[in-house]
Regions:
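Intrinsically disordered, low-complexity polar regions and short flexible loop motifs
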Residues: 1-229
Length: 229
């Protein structure tokens, strides 16, 4: 379970489930993930100014969800989106319209409209895409003007992602990416001195040092075997 704060004009909000605090987030931020048991769960969102929202949801065993605080005409509400599973080797993407002042919107990927007149709070189906970068545009269906120009969305193989379009009421419209699911790595995790493998693709210094020692030993052996003149 993750929590997305998409209520403009509201300060840092805190979400709890059955009395247990899950996390806090400011506008456009995401808290979590948190693991919850399946079954009926009572969520409470609290924010400054006496804002208190409540939602009761039945969580299915093994499913993943994102709880989003969304604005309404006069206040706010909680909406729970069920997340899709990841597909090994593929990238999956959907878009959620969470910017009320945009009205209905056309959504385009790499210049092609893939969702017509998406309404506020709507979630598109997931699209299965090749890993890489997708250019997202949000367009006004009437004027065809772009509410959001092209935004490059990085999509990795084996991941499922939701792009939440948030904003309005003084908050600039933007895209917030939320990780919905990830497939398990196909290879066993690397281990070494200290039990940690490099995470940024940098060199493994323990292996580099061992290689240097091996090369040095080989050079010394060759020198010893070289006949004297």
């Amino acid at each position: 379970m993750r929590f997305l704060h998409a209520v403009p004009g509201v300060g840092v909000a805190t979400v709890s489930a059955d009395g247990q605090t899950l996390g806090s987030a400011g506008f456009g931020q995401v808290a979590g993930p948190a693991t919850l048991p399946s079954g009926t769960t009572h969520f409470v969102l609290k924010a400054p100014g006496g804002v208190t929202l409540k939602k009761t949801v039945r969580l299915a065993d093994g499913d993943s969800y994102t709880l989003a605080g969304l604005a309404t005409a006069n206040a706010a509400t909680i909406h729970v989106y069920r997340n899709g599973a990841a597909d090994p080797g593929k990238a999956r993407l959907r878009v959620v319209h969470a910017a009320p002042e945009l009205g209905d919107a056309n959504l385009a990927l790499d210049g092609k409209v893939v969702a017509h007149r998406a309404a506020y709070e709507d979630a598109t189906d997931y699209w299965t895409l090749p890993p890489g970068r997708e250019q997202l545009e949000v367009r006004d269906p009437g004027s065809k003007k772009m509410a959001i120009g092209m935004r490059a969305l990085p999509l990795s193989a084996g991941t499922t992602t939701t792009a939440y379009v948030v904003g309005s009421k003084g908050e600039r419209v933007r895209v917030v990416l939320v990780d919905d699911a990830t497939t398990a790595p196909s290879a066993a995790p690397q281990t070494g001195l200290g039990g940690l493998a490099p995470r940024d693709g940098g060199p493994n210094w323990a292996l580099a040092a061992a290689a240097a020692l091996a090369i040095g030993g080989a050079i010394a052996l060759l020198r010893r075997r070289r006949p004297s003149r």
